[in-house]
Amino acid sequence: MKPHLPMKQSVIALSVLSAISVTSLTAMAQDSKEQQAVTNKEKLETIQVTGRSLSYANSTISSEMKKQQTPMTSALSIIDNLPGVLVNEGDPFGSDEWSTSISMRGFQLDLASQQIGMTVDGISNGNSNYGGGTKASRYIDTENLRSVEVSQGTADISSRSNEALGGTLDFTTIRPRLDEKLTVSTTLGQYNARKFYTRYDTGEIAKDTFAWVSISTQQNDDYMGGSITNSRDHAEGKIISRVGEVDLTGYLSYDDAEEYTYQRIYGLGQYAQEPNWDGLTNNFSGVPYQDQAFRETWGTERENLFGYLQADFMVNDVEVSSNVYYHKNEGMGK
C-alpha cells in the first residue's frame, strides 16, 4: 500500500494545469497587445507631404509686417520690408500711381518699365503699368489682404501674369468667415487723412456657401501744400461655395479714384535745393508757361473693375483648376 502516490500525481497534475494556464494567459495578453496596436494604427491620420523645387527666392509677408502698416497705406507698402524688394510711392497713402515704382533685384515696374507681374488670388489682372492698366493694390483694400507671395526672378510656369520677366507679386484676399460678423473701422491721420471701412461676413448663406462684402472711402490732402485732395471709393466682395465635388470661388472689385500726382525730383541737386517741394505750384497765375506746373491740372480720374470665377475639382487623381476673369480700366487726365 502506497498512500502517497495519489498525492504526487495530484501535484504533477496541478503543475501541468498551472503551466497551461500561464501559457494561455501569456498568449491572451500577447493577442490583446497586438489587437491594441492594430487599433491604434488604424486611428492614426494619414499625413501627406508634398514638395517642389524652386529655382528662385520666394518669400511671403508675415503678420508682423502687416501690423507695421496702417489701413490707409496701400497693399504695396506691406511688401517693402521683404529682402530684395524696394517700393517707392509719392506719399505714405499710396494715392498717386504716377509716382509709384517697384524694384526687385534690378527689375523695375514704373512709368517706363513693366518687368514685374502682379496677380490677385493667382489670377491675372491685366497690365500693371500706369498707362494701360493698374496695380493689384487698386483692387484690394488693405483690410481685405490675407498675404502677398513674392517670387523673385523669372516667374515659374504657374504664374498667370503676362509681364513676369523679373518676378511676380501674388496678392491673396481673405477667405469668408464661417460665422456672421460685421467689421467697422475708422482711420484718421495727418494731412486731413481719413478712411471709413465696413465689411460684412455673411456666414453660411446656403449649403456650404459663405461670402463677404466690403465698402470703403478715403481722402487725404497732398503734403506739399495741401491745395488738392486725393480720394478713393472702393467696393469689394468674395464668395466661396462647394457644389458636389467642385469648389467655386467668385471675386469682384470696383475702385473709383481721383488722384493728383507729385512731380519727380531730378537729381540730388534739386532735392538739396528744396527737399520739401516737387516744383508744382499751388496757385493759378494766368501765365501759361507757369501754369503748366499748376498742381490741380496734374490729376487723373480712374475707374478700375476686376472680377473672376474659379472652379477647383479632381479628375481621378489629377487636380484641375479653371477660371475666367474680367478687368476694365478707364481714366482721364484733368
Predicted regions and their residues:
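Extracytoplasmic beta-strand/coil segments of soluble accessory domains associated
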Residues: 36-39, 76, 80-124
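N-terminal periplasmic accessory domains that precede
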Residues: 75-78, 101-106, 119, 136-138, ...
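N-terminal periplasmic "start-of-domain" segments of outer-membrane beta-barrel proteins
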Residues: 41-76, 96-101, 150
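Transmembrane beta-barrel wall of Gram-negative outer-membrane proteins
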Residues: 181-268, 298-314
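Outer-membrane beta-barrel and related beta-rich outer-membrane complex signature
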Residues: 225, 249-292, 331-334
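Short acidic/polar hinge/loop motifs at secondary-structure boundaries
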Residues: 123-152, 172
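Cleavable N-terminal targeting peptides that direct proteins into the secretory/outer-membrane pathway or into
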Residues: 1-38
